[in-house]
Amino acid sequence: MARIAGINIPPHQHAEIGLTAIYGIGRTTARKICEAAGIAYSKKIKELTDGDLEKIRDQLTSLTLEGDLRRETTMNIKRLMDIGCYRGFRHRRGLPMRGQRTRTNARTRKGPRKGAAALKK
């Protein structure tokens, strides 16, 4: 099993799909990494040589991934909340922040429905 950026990549997957197991890498980025490293993205992870894995690791050094990316995202949201802007306020209240309606829908952000009895109190 290949280990890249501290993540075990499933060996049976193609290189393009396997790289998406790393937080911060999607299909497009994975494909660009494979092209830059000179690896066919249809090649399975278990078929990659140590040299191929090193080429992939070299490509990943320029990207913000995993814990650093999660930390950066969290800090950006915290900054919005600290400055008291509209988006920060909506984050704090757990509501959608991009103008969607909330009278109905928005259940993903708001969570499960509260019963009518809970609203009357």
From Swiss-Prot:
Q: Does the keyword Ribosomal protein belong to this entry?
A: yes
Gene Ontology cellular-component annotations: cytosol; small ribosomal subunit
**Which Gene3D superfamilies does its entry note?**
1.10.8.50, 30s ribosomal protein s13, domain 2
Question: Could you cite one Gene Ontology molecular function of this protein?
Answer: structural constituent of ribosome
Sorted keywords for this record are: Ribonucleoprotein, Ribosomal protein, RNA-binding, rRNA-binding, tRNA-binding
Please provide an example of a Pfam family that matches this protein in its UniProt record. Ribosomal_S13
Q: Record's superkingdom?
A: Bacteria
Instruction: Write out the ranges of the annotated region (Disordered).
Output: 94-121
Kindly list the biological process annotations in GO that this record carries: translation
Output the NCBIfam families linked to this UniProt entry.
Answer: uS13_bact
Function, as annotated, reads: Located at the top of the head of the 30S subunit, it contacts several helices of the 16S rRNA. In the 70S ribosome it contacts the 23S rRNA (bridge B1a) and protein L5 of the 50S subunit (bridge B1b), connecting the 2 subunits; these bridges are implicated in subunit movement. Contacts the tRNAs in the A and P-sites.
Its assembly, as annotated, is: Part of the 30S ribosomal subunit. Forms a loose heterodimer with protein S19. Forms two bridges to the 50S subunit in the 70S ribosome.
What's this protein's family per the entry? Belongs to the universal ribosomal protein uS13 family.
State the name under which the record lists this protein: Small ribosomal subunit protein uS13
